[in-house]
Curated annotation (Swiss-Prot):
Gene Ontology molecular function: FMN binding; FMN reductase [NAD(P)H] activity
Any one annotated GO CC term: cytosol
Gene name, Swiss-Prot/TrEMBL: ntnL
Record: residues binding FMN: 12, 90-93, 120
Pathway(s) where this gene product acts: Secondary metabolite biosynthesis; terpenoid biosynthesis
Stated name of the protein: NAD(P)H-dependent FMN reductase ntnL
EC number: 1.5.1.39
Keywords: Flavoprotein, FMN, NAD, NADP, Oxidoreductase
GO BP field: terpenoid biosynthetic process
Subunit: Homodimer.
Role description: NAD(P)H-dependent FMN reductase; part of the gene cluster that mediates the biosynthesis of the meroterpenoids nectripenoids A and B, as well as cochliquninone D and isocochliquninone E. The pathway probably begins with the HR-PKS ntnH that catalyzes two chain-extension steps to form a reduced triketide, which then primes the SAT domain in the NR-PKS ntnG to initiate three more cycles of extension to give a linear hexaketide corresponding to the polyketide part of nectripenoids.
Organism encoding this protein: Nectria sp
Length: 201
């Protein structure tokens, strides 16, 4: 059985990412029975500082080793999965620093594995989605699912509750369902499944 990490990219507190990732997880649970095991993975739980290792990630493990416990834990966690689904916010028109820092902590744990990207924000996080897609595909040599899911918050009180209170509003959830976002998420997962069948390059 292949294990897929459902990675929550935000490290802020409060963060609406908890609710968004929960909503996405519920959608994924609605899929027909398959041989995938999907597990939530929260970047904030690893307490990663700005990269503080004395070695380049690309040198690990062939030539060097990580020296910090947080790096070792993060590396071991990511290495244990065969694929990933990122759920990421967009801050100030781009990828969140905590997300990028966590990705850049590692190198050899990523290449050849499939990944889907789901983003959220006032406009759905399209810029952050595109930036992470490019980084993972071109630099980390990952297989990025073609379907990029954008989850924009409903206008009005939902935006304020998301930003200020870390709460996902009912109107946003309703709008996502009506816009076919659940189907998009399941389509992205199907693409990850197909990419899993391809040999690593």
């Amino acid at each position: 059985m292949a294990k897929i990490a459902l990675i929550l990219g935000s490290v802020r507190s409060p963060r609406v990412g908890n609710d968004v990732t929960g909503w996405v997880h519920d959608v994924l649970k609605s899929r027909p029975s398959d041989d995938l095991q999907i597990e939530p993975l929260v970047i904030a739980d690893f307490n990663l500082p700005v990269y503080d290792e004395p070695v380049m990630p690309a040198m690990v493990p062939a030539m060097k080793q990580f020296t910090k416990e947080h790096s070792k834990r993060w590396s071991a966690a990511i290495a244990s999965y065969q694929g990933y689904i990122f759920v990421i916010p967009e801050y100030n028109g781009g990828i969140a620093g905590g997300t990028k820092n966590a990705v850049d902590y590692l190198y050899n744990e990523w290449p050849g594995k499939p990944v889907a990207i789901i983003s959220y924000g006032t406009q759905g996080g399209n810029r952050a989605n595109a930036q992470l897609s490019e980084s993972l595909e071109l630099v980390m040599k990952m297989k990025v699912a073609p379907t990029k899911v954008l989850l924009p918050f409903a206008a009005g009180t939902d935006v304020f509750s998301a930003i200020n209170d870390g709460v996902l509003g009912e109107e946003s959830q309703k709008a996502w369902a009506e816009a076919g976002k659940k189907e998009d998420i399941l389509k992205a997962l199907d693409e990850v499944k197909e990419l899993l069948k391809q040999p690593k390059e």
